Swiss-Prot record:
The gene is rpsG. GO terms for molecular function: rRNA binding; structural constituent of ribosome; tRNA binding. InterPro entries: Ribosomal_uS7 (IPR000235), Ribosomal_uS7_bac/org-type (IPR005717), Ribosomal_uS7_CS (IPR020606), Ribosomal_uS7_dom (IPR023798), Ribosomal_uS7_dom_sf (IPR036823). This is Small ribosomal subunit protein uS7. Belongs to the universal ribosomal protein uS7 family. It comes from the Bacteria. The lineage of its organism: Bacteria, Bacillati, Chloroflexota, Chloroflexia, Chloroflexales. GO terms for biological process: translation. One of the primary rRNA binding proteins, it binds directly to 16S rRNA where it nucleates assembly of the head domain of the 30S subunit. Is located at the subunit interface close to the decoding center, probably blocks exit of the E-site tRNA. The keyword Ribonucleoprotein applies. PROSITE patterns: RIBOSOMAL_S7. Part of the 30S ribosomal subunit. Contacts proteins S9 and S11. It comes from Chloroflexus aggregans (strain MD-66 / DSM 9485). Pfam families: Ribosomal_S7. GO terms for cellular component: small ribosomal subunit.
Amino acid sequence: MPRRGVVERRPIPPDARYNSVLVQKFINKVMERGKKSLAERIVYQALDLAAEKLKKPQLEIFEQALRNASPSIEVKPKRVGGATYQVPVEVKSDRRYSLAMRWLIMSARARTGKPMVERLAAELIDAYNNTGTTIKRKEDVHRMAEANRAFAHYGRL
């Protein structure tokens, strides 16, 4: 345990265009090697492209895609007397959105043949429509938790 106590988390300022903290976090996750302006351009253009295809507001698409992609339950390994069990636990809201963002970006990067803007837009549209790689990932996590429901009581120890 640290002696100095817990450090207060710095608040993330909202992004300039939508005044949303979630969009700013997403931009920060898309960013590589400190190139924030490039990450902003990618995210904003992807949201514009998705809005153009779905004929809905950008922020609504983004927030719905995040809600659809975020897991409500996951498994965590817990060691009990020599055996390691995968114990299902509820996911806190911060981690929920963080995982959804991470999965969206990973799925977009895994797609091939198109610029990142188009890949990210396609992944956001898929998540908005409850289809695609990101949603499959979430369902796999839920399936794992369901399969290990018998060990749920270890989470309460």
